[in-house]
Amino acid sequence: MPAPGQITQWLQRLHDGDEAALEHLMPLLYDELRLLARKQLRGEWPGHTLLTTDLVGEVYLRLVEQRRLRAADRPQFFAIAAITMRRILVDYARTRKRLKRGGGQVPIPLEEAEQFLTEQEADEVLALDAALERLAVLEPRAVQVVQCRFYSGLTLEETAQALDVSARTVQRDWIAARAWLRKEITQDLQF
């Protein structure tokens, strides 16, 4: 268990541009990141082949690539980690969909293909991602709320703290964003 304030100190160093800080942070936050990844994967399709450990490792690699990570505290760090997980899962869905259509790969036996996304599941993941991108143009804060609540699993209060707004504002954005996304995704999937 990290000493009190240790994580905050490393987050501050990371925020200030210390590239080595992430290497010190990851072991301290690994268990929490695994819980977040497990929660993310639990909401995915049956037969998903991406493991919790793989997702956490991929998050680490992508965060390292970002060079300058802007996370002043835990909620902000986990919001960034959740957004990164979402991007990884969307990329994974795109890859699976491409593989199902051949993707320039050697054909595989049908029984091995069952582990991949169904066409509908891949379409749902991609429809959610596309809808979030459209919503970001209209209501950027609402997308941040969705990312914090849905992908990070943050509470209303934690989301409010991470975004520096009131819990009531988060609640309004959360309700409106969910309704808007539901409508958009339903329309996207009807085509």
Please provide the spans of the model-predicted regions.
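Sigma70-family region 2
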Residues: 12-16, 39-46, 58-77
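Short, charged helix-capping/linker segments at alpha-helix termini
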Residues: 16-24, 35-56, 167, 190
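Amphipathic alpha-helical segment used for protein-protein interaction
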Residues: 33, 83, 115-144
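Short, Lys/Arg-enriched C-terminal cap helix and immediately downstream tail that follows
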Residues: 37, 178-191
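Arg/Lys-rich amphipathic alpha helix in sigma70-family domain 2
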Residues: 39-42, 86-105
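Short amphipathic alpha helix immediately N-terminal
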Residues: 136-158
